[in-house]
Regions:
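Conserved acetyl-CoA pyrophosphate-binding loop and the N-cap/start of the following alpha-helix
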Residues: 87-99
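Conserved GNAT acetyl-CoA-binding A-motif
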Residues: 102-115
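Conserved beta-strand in the GNAT
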Residues: 55, 62-70, 77-82
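A short, internal acetyl-CoA/4′-phosphopantetheine-binding micro-motif in the GNAT/acyltransferase core
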Residues: 81-88, 112-114
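A short helix-loop-beta-strand connector motif used in the catalytic cores of GNAT acetyltransferases and
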Residues: 38-55, 150-153
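Conserved GNAT-fold acetyl-CoA-binding loop/helix
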Residues: 18-43
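A short beta-loop-alpha structural element at the N-terminal edge
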Residues: 1-15
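Conserved active-site alpha-helix within GNAT-family acetyltransferase domains
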Residues: 94, 115-150
C-alpha cells in the first residue's frame, strides 16, 4: 500500500534512505559521500523545505520504500527515492514513482548522480528523458539548492521531456 508518511515515521524514512544509499558508496564522488548519507538534520531540513514523503508498506505494515515530492515554482521534483535493499527488484520503486507522477500535471524533474547508472536506467525505464548538460546545469541551479560540486556530478531527467 502507498500512503503519505506520517511525521512520527522520520526514523523509518531515515533508516530506508541510508540503507539504500549504501549503494552509492564508492560510486559517487568521495567528497560527496557522507556517513550517514543523509543526516537526521538534513532529513528534517528537507521536510521543512516542502519535501512530502510517500511510503510503500509491505504486508506487515512496515515501510520498505520511500519517495518524496517537492513542488518548486512550475515543476515538481522527485526527491530521495529509496527502497530497502532486501525489497529492491520487486517493483516497489516503480509503484511509488507511478503513484506520485499521476498526482500532478506539472513537469516532473529528477536529479541523481551521473555515476548512478542503475538510477538513471530506472527513471528512463519509467519514461523520463535525460536533459542536455547545459539544460541540466540551469535546472539544478534554478530548482535545487545544492552545491556547485553536486551540480557538476549530477544529471537531470524530465517527464515530459523538454523539446
Amino acid at each position: 500500500m502507498i500512503r503519505l508518511c506520517r511525521d512520527d515515521e522520520r526514523d523509518a524514512i531515515f533508516a530506508i534512505v541510508n540503507a539504500a544509499a549504501e549503494k552509492y558508496r564508492g560510486v559517487i564522488p568521495a567528497d560527496r559521500w557522507h556517513d550517514p548519507y543523509m543526516s537526521r538534520e538534513e532529513l528534517d531540513g528537507e521536510i521543512a523545505a516542502g519535501v512530502a514523503f510517500s511510503g510503500y508498506e509491505d504486508g506487515d505494515g512496515q515501510l520498505i520504500g520511500v519517495m518524496g515530492v517537492q513542488p518548486v515554482r512550475d515543476v515538481v521534483l522527485i526527491r530521495h527515492a529509496y527502497v530497502l535493499p532486501a525489497a529492491q527488484g520487486r517493483g516497489v520503486g516503480g509503484k511509488l514513482l507511478a503513484h506520485l507522477t499521476t498526482e500532478t500535471s506539472e513537469r516532473i524533474l529528477i536529479g541523481t548522480w551521473a555515476t548512478a547508472e542503475w538510477a538513471i536506467g530506472f527513471y528512463r525505464n519509467h519514461g523520463f528523458v535525460q536533459v542536455t548538460p547545459e539544460l541540466k546545469d540551469r535546472l539544478l541551479q534554478t530548482y535545487w539548492n545544492i552545491p556547485e560540486r553536486q551540480i557538476a556530478t549530477s544529471v537531470v531527467l524530465a517527464k515530459p521531456p523538454f523539446e
